[in-house]
C-alpha cells in the first residue's frame, strides 16, 4: 500500500478557480478583513468613505492572499507531511510552483497599485512590510528557528486593524496600536492550542512548536498566562474611551469564556479540549471585534439623536 506522501506526489490534476481560491486561505483573510474594517470604522467619526472602504479592504485582502499563496509555495514540502495540510493544491499537484509564484506576485502588485493609487502611501508601505514579514521572515526563517515563532511572527498577523486605521487617517495612533496588541496577544494561545492538537504533525514536519520543544504542560501554562494578559489588555479600548459599555460588557463575557477554556485545557487530559479551545479563540476574536463595531455605531447613533 502506498503512503499518503506517495499518493500526493503522483496525483496530477488541472487547476480550477477553487484551487487558486484555496491558495489564498480565504477564511483567514476574511477574519483579517473583519479586523481591518473595525480599524477603519473606529478611525472615522462617521461613515467611512466608500473609496477608502472599498479600495482599502481590497488592497489588504489581495496582500493577505498573496502572503498566503507564498506560504503555500514555500512550505509545500512540509505540507505533504501534515494531516492538516496535505490536501492543499500545490501538494496535490493541482497548481505547480511556477504558477503559484506568478499568482502571488500578481496579487501583491495589484495590492500595492490599489493602495498607493486609491488609499495612501503609508497604508501601502505598512501592508507590504506585513506581507514580507509573514511570507518572508516568518515562513522562511522564524517558523523553523524558534518555538517562539508564533509570538514574534504574530506581529504580522496582528497588523490588519492598524492597516484599516491608517487607511482612513493616514497616520498611526494609540487606539490602532491597542487593536494590534489585542491580536498580538491572542495569537499565541490560539495557535498553541492547535499545536497541542496537531503535535504529531509538527513533529513529522520538524517544526519547533512549543508543545514539541517544551512539552504540553509548559505550553498549557503559557496559554493561560497569555490569556490572562489578553484579558487585561482587551479592556484598554474601554479605558481610553475608544469604546463604551456595549464593548465592555461583551468583552467581560468573552474573556470569561476564554479563561474557562484556558483553565480547562490546563486541568484536563481529554483529547478534544485543545481543538475546542482553538475553535473558541476564533469566535472570541470575531465577536470582540464585532462588539467594537456595534458599540461604535450605537454610540454614534445616540449622539445624533
UniProtKB/Swiss-Prot annotation:
Highest taxon in the source lineage: Bacteria
- Record's keyword annotation contains Membrane: yes
Gene Ontology BP terms: heme biosynthetic process; heme O biosynthetic process
Q: Which UniProt keywords apply?
A: Cell inner membrane, Cell membrane, Heme biosynthesis, Membrane, Transferase, Transmembrane, Transmembrane helix
Reactions that this protein is recorded to catalyse: heme b + (2E,6E)-farnesyl diphosphate + H2O = Fe(II)-heme o + diphosphate
Enzyme Commission number, as recorded: 2.5.1.141
**InterPro entries in the record, alphabetically?**
Protohaem_IX_farnesylTrfase, UbiA_prenyltransferase, UbiA_prenylTrfase_CS, UbiA_sf
**Functional description taken from the UniProt entry:** Converts heme B (protoheme IX) to heme O by substitution of the vinyl group on carbon 2 of heme B porphyrin ring with a hydroxyethyl farnesyl side group.
Q: Which family does it belong to?
A: Belongs to the UbiA prenyltransferase family. Protoheme IX farnesyltransferase subfamily.
- Record's PANTHER family? 4-HYDROXYBENZOATE SOLANESYLTRANSFERASE (PTHR43448:SF7), PROTOHEME IX FARNESYLTRANSFERASE, MITOCHONDRIAL (PTHR43448)
Annotated NCBIfam families: cyoE_ctaB, PRK04375.1-2
This protein's name: Protoheme IX farnesyltransferase
The organism of origin for this protein: Coxiella burnetii (strain RSA 493 / Nine Mile phase I)
Gene field = cyoE
Amino acid at each position: 500500500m502506498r503512503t499518503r506522501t506517495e499518493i500526493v506526489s503522483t496525483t496530477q490534476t488541472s487547476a480550477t478557480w477553487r484551487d487558486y481560491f484555496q491558495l489564498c486561505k480565504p477564511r483567514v483573510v476574511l477574519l483579517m478583513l473583519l479586523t481591518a474594517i473595525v480599524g477603519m470604522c473606529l478611525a472615522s467619526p462617521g461613515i467611512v468613505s466608500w473609496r477608502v472602504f472599498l479600495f482599502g479592504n481590497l488592497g489588504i485582502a489581495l496582500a493577505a492572499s498573496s502572503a498566503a499563496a507564498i506560504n503555500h509555495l514555500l512550505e509545500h514540502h512540509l505540507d505533504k507531511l501534515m494531516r492538516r495540510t496535505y490536501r492543499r493544491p500545490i501538494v496535490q499537484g493541482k497548481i505547480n510552483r511556477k504558477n503559484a509564484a506568478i499568482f502571488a506576485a500578481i496579487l501583491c502588485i495589484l495590492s500595492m497599485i490599489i493602495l498607493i493609487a486609491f488609499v495612501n502611501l503609508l497604508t501601502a508601505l505598512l501592508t507590504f512590510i506585513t506581507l514580507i514579514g509573514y511570507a518572508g521572515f516568518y515562513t522562511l526563517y522564524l517558523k523553523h528557528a524558534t518555538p517562539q515563532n508564533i509570538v514574534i511572527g504574530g506581529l504580522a498577523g496582528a497588523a490588519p486593524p492598524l492597516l484599516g486605521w491608517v487607511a482612513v487617517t493616514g497616520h498611526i495612533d494609540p487606539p490602532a496600536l491597542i487593536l494590534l496588541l489585542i491580536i498580538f496577544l491572542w495569537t499565541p494561545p490560539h495557535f498553541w492550542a492547535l499545536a497541542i492538537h496537531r503535535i504529531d504533525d509538527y513533529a513529522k514536519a520538524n517544526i519547533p512548536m512549543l508543545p514539541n520543544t517544551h512539552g504540553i504542560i509548559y505550553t498549557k501554562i503559557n496559554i493561560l498566562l497569555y490569556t490572562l494578559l489578553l484579558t487585561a489588555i482587551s479592556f484598554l479600548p474601554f479605558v481610553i474611551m475608544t469604546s463604551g459599555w456595549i464593548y465592555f460588557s461583551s468583552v467581560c463575557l468573552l474573556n470569561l469564556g476564554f479563561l474557562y477554556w484556558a483553565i480547562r485545557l490546563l486541568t484536563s487530559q481529554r483529547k478534544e479540549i485543545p481543538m475546542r479551545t482553538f475553535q473558541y479563540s476564533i469566535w472570541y476574536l470575531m465577536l470582540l471585534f464585532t462588539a467594537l463595531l456595534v458599540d461604535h455605531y450605537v454610540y454614534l447613533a445616540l449622539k445624533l439623536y
